[in-house]
């Protein structure tokens, strides 16, 4: 299904969203935390650049509204809902792997640290990889 293509993922929120574009192997091509008001513009911009055919959307509380807006804007784009369970915890760990703590913070267990910036973009990456794993196993 995803052979050779790209996919986008969104962790929708009321004020901000995580957004990421990955290739079929799960390599991150783009990631960003964006204001929800700019979501449609950002998706459109990256759609033109990366030509993804699937957009993975976290199934949280604002997913229905986000799905409707995206499908209205890009009717040919397949929007797939993915379970968000525990993705925030996973995203915090991924954040610290990508940006290891410095100074005295490196002495603390990562589970005790709070990232200094939103991790919604890392959540989007996790959602995309969950989708890819499901596609590889035939669950999607």
Question: In which residue ranges do the predicted regions lie?
Answer:
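Phosphate- and other anionic-substrate recognition elements at nucleic-acid/protein interfaces
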Residues: 2-10, 14-140
């Amino acid at each position: 299904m995803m052979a050779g293509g790209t996919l986008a993922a969104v962790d929708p929120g009321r004020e901000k969203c995580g957004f990421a574009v990955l290739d079929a192997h799960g390599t991150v091509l783009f990631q960003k935390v964006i204001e929800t008001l700019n979501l449609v513009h950002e998706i459109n911009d990256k759609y033109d650049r990366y030509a993804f055919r699937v957009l993975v959307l976290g199934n949280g509380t604002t997913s229905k509204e986000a799905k409707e807006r995206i499908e209205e804007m890009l009717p040919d784009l397949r929007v797939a809902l993915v379970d968000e369970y525990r993705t925030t915890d996973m995203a915090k760990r991924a954040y610290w792997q990508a940006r290891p703590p410095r100074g005295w913070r490196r002495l603390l267990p990562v589970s005790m640290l709070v990232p200094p910036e939103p991790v919604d973009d890392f959540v989007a990456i996790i959602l995309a990889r969950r989708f890819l794993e499901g596609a590889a196993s035939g669950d999607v």
